[in-house]
Amino acid sequence: MALKHQLNHAVEDNLGSKAPIGPCGFIYIYPETHFNFKEISLLGDKYAEAGAFSLPLLHGVTVEEAFVPNVKAVYKKIDMTTVSVKLSTFYNRAIIFHNVEKFESIFSGPGLGSLCKEACDLFGYVPFTPLGEGSTDVSDICPPVWQEKDAIMAVVITEGFKERLHLGKLIYLKSQMHSVMINKTEVYRIPLYDEDLFTKKSSLRRLYLPAVSEYLYYTLYTSLAQSLRVHNAASLVEAIQEQFVHDKYKMAKLVSFKEYPLATVGACDTTLMVIDAVAAELGLSYSLSFFEAPQEKTKVQDYYSWDIFASCETDSDRLEALSKWNALQAIHIHAQLFSTNSIYYVNRVARQAPIPNSKVEPNVYNSYYLQHGLANLCEETLFEDGSPAFTGAPASSLDGSSFTLQHLAYAAAFSPNLLARMCYYLQFCQHQKSTLNPAYNITEYVGSAANSPVCSLCSGQCPCVCINTLFYRLKDRFPPVLQGSRRDPYVITGITNVFNELDFLGNFASFRDKDEDQNQTEETPRYTYWQLNQTLTEKLEAAGLVDSPVADEGAGGSGSMNLEKFVRTFSDIDSLVDAEAAKFINTMIKNNVNFKESIKGVSHVIQYNCNTYWQAPCSLMLNLYYRSILTIIQDIALPISTVYESENPAQGYKPNEWLKLHYQTLWTNFKSFFIDKGVITGTEMKVVHAEQFSDFFDVDAATNNMYSPVKVQVRLARAQVLALKNIKVKNRILFSGTSMSEHYQNAFLKTANRRDNYILAGPYVKFLNSFHRQLFPNLKISCLYLWSNFCKKKQIPCVPGVSAEALNKFFSYINNNSKQFEEVNMLDVVPDSYVTYAKQRLNNAILRACGQTQFYAVTIHSIFPKVQETCALEYPHVLGTSSVDSVEDYVNNVQNLKALTVNSSLRESAANLARSRPIVTLPVVVNKYTGIAGNAQLFQSANLGYFMGRGVDKNLLGDSLFVKKQQNSYMRKKYLFMTPLVGNLLKPSYTHQGTAFEIETVKRTIQSILEDQADEDVLNRVVCELVKSLGAGCADLTLDDIQFYLGSYGMFSENILEKLDQLRELVGPWTHEWAESVLKSGTCETDEVQFVAFEEEQVKLTSMDHSGKVVGGKKRKIATMFDDLDL
């Protein structure tokens, strides 16, 4: 019983139960002096004509440090002493609605509002219409201590009550206005409650702000409507309100205004219509409940502790730091906008057509899929009864198959706020000129075309910041407008957890979820792959071999590199790696691990974090988070809809009729189908309210603008809440040749033919190039020519000052090892640092031991943003809203200015970045399958895919044939865009992980010497290492110091101290060479000692009589037996 009580308590002790009762939201009223408008505007999404915009919920900026992110919001009075509450977290934006003009626009180009309205009408979406009742008078909200013109006002609302705010159904209680401290400033806030809480509704002060409603309508609801494939966002708002307020999660809500493509309705394809409708309904029911579920607050919200501000001293420093951070985020928005398969462009449910002459059997669970295709936007749609929903966009309104500004507005959900933020990010983007567009010239365009009054947006008044100018500069990078035709991955964006497995072999030998008997102890502890990588890195660090080589440093530290040292360095690394690989394989053999089988299923794993407060503080990032979750939920819903419809055919039914019969069953089944089935992990919270009576106020008195405290009982509207934790994205590392097309197999197949340039594609080329001048100081030819000539002609140059024997030995080493590397290498990567070289050799050894020698493994590569300043000649936005008279005028004004841009790099390790909680943008395809051995359960796997589109990033363009001649070899590499939060917004939690103490490094080096060396000189080597590391500091070492360095070998401390005493008596220069020569001269020769084999003799410890004969009394029997033992 006690255990059962503890379990119940554990389940009930959760974020939901801990949430206090409170209002549905707040109006915050800040003094004008609270904000540094230039700085804070960089966090917002204000455009030039904005009536409202939003800022993230940040402690010290928009909310107080003690702000509680979850609340049991009171929304209805059941009787005189009982209130009903709904649990919800807060929407992660504060919407500014008063004195908006005091903030600066994130993008200064005019006409965004009119462009969005035009695009909204063109693509058939229902525009925002304000309610008939008037707007709330903000003068009534303003505290009496301030004037209205000196106050900034914002609304902070819970996720569940956003729709009530949008529809003007919330009441503000001015009698309960109170102050809070935000960054040492007194700020007032007024609580908001639902109108259903009050009985006398005529005298209530309703909060209706058309600018706020319009902001939510486009930024949030139209974006959700696009993901759900409906055009009527106004009806969607009503549906979401019904779902939350009246708990209609199990009811179909969209099908009454759901529309379908003309071709689907025309063909009477009710199956496709029903599956489309069910996916949208389940997506709405579950996704919205996840967004409302309680979340933990995060360190991202602590604005004034962001790491980017750590070294800032002035306001301009902070502005620069924030601009650079925005530039780092920008690469993710670029990837989304320029990808053909972006989540912005997913807009259909389609059926997969069978591939003719294909060897691969079709998977019925993947037969329906979410399809991207910008051309679908122009297609006519109908309601289920055949009545027109959208008549289609005329072809004359667009530009054939070319991307237009209207498509960009569509990606922004016709929200001028989101569009302004998009344009701000696009200003950091470097253009890529197409070979099909030779007329491109931004200088000519700004000075002669953009400044003409023909421009419909700016009339030529501000050509430098006009969106038309920005679009002209980047037009070649946008994707073509094409029809979707196949099942492709879609690109999602969000934050990951810190526990990702992106090393070469991912989750190999992690031993998680595979231990059948957790309590069984093993003779040898399990040595995981993660531990192996850590050990290898530490040993390389101890040897000074962790950084990429540069020309000024040697391999083992400072000093010049030479041929002998180069060979010795890599020989040492090879020995170290081979020893660790052998130890790892032997450990698995001892533990009876079937590693040859387990390696076939290894994957890279990326954990996508579903906490809204972990998302990057940007309205576009939050929008992408919502769309990513909603799209993945719908994708997972497709197979259950397919299976259920096949058992309950929809033929003869309209979707509305069919859903009335079956939706509740589908909703119930779906809950058990998708949680912890391969993609989504979640937790079910049993929510309770511990207080028997809670503090509240008299509702009737509040109607008369009076505050009267009372005690109430609390009743929860929903006691069970399902919350998302992670989305697991996997990448299969090893190719499985079965059931794959020949085209796919050829991309991974390792051929027996040796490449002509095997050295230039080998393991040493980066190092040979970095050290070229030091290895061959008097040679006047380049590294590239030297080694390509050697590969082709096998000729060695004559180098003055270097013997032919030394040269021959060096070239033989490089030649033989490069050939050997090519034969055994299963990772299509050229190492660029000592760590990468060592890990590549290590993983090749493991793959070889596991029998994987036929196909290349898939490798993960991170595309990492790098901020750089470039000449502003082709970045006209640096001139702001100033006018331009001519080309010469533009050039004169801009030629001496610099523009902040973002470049991309492949030089950062994905495995290292994955530990720093990065923002990630990656393509994902959700595959569905049944269990093995007759298990009929459906499972899913979110697999990493490929980006589509040539303008996404320069690093995604195919390699030339200089190094590779095998077709489709690009498929061996998969890419993610990664921007770490740690080091930007978050301070590193454990600084010692990255920067070890010097004494730790010395200790590791000494212990590795003691472990790996068994010759007579081992103690001398330890002393020499101490002298090398500590220099003259060795003169002051005590016995305790030496014992620390020796660790478990501390019993030899006195021997080391004796040798140090010898050196102290001589008083030399305390260098490694000096100590080595002194100790060597004082060491006796060991050649005279002869060893013979030792034959172990089997000796019995005792000759006990186990006959059981009693030799004493019963009580003395054991004592008597012990007396016989000779211990």
Swiss-Prot record:
Record GO terms (molecular function): single-stranded DNA binding
Coiled coil regions, renumbered to chain: none
Protein name: Major DNA-binding protein
Quaternary context: Homooligomers. Forms double-helical filaments necessary for the formation of replication compartments within the host nucleus. Interacts with the origin-binding protein. Interacts with the helicase primase complex; this interaction stimulates primer synthesis activity of the helicase-primase complex. Interacts with the DNA polymerase. Interacts with the alkaline exonuclease; this interaction increases its nuclease processivity.
Pfam families linked: Viral_DNA_bp (PF00747)
Region of interest called Required for nuclear localization, as start-end residue ranges on this chain: 1098-1127
Organism lineage: Viruses, Duplodnaviria, Heunggongvirae, Peploviricota, Herviviricetes
Subcellular location: Host nucleus
Family from the record: Belongs to the herpesviridae major DNA-binding protein family.
The keyword DNA-binding belongs to this UniProt entry's keyword annotation: yes
Gene: DBP
Keywords: DNA replication, DNA-binding, Host nucleus
SS bond list: none
Role description: Plays several crucial roles in viral infection. Participates in the opening of the viral DNA origin to initiate replication by interacting with the origin-binding protein. May disrupt loops, hairpins and other secondary structures present on ssDNA to reduce and eliminate pausing of viral DNA polymerase at specific sites during elongation. Promotes viral DNA recombination by performing strand-transfer, characterized by the ability to transfer a DNA strand from a linear duplex to a complementary single-stranded DNA circle. Can also catalyze the renaturation of complementary single strands.
Keyword ATP-binding attached: no
Biological process according to GO: DNA replication
GO terms for cellular component: host cell nucleus
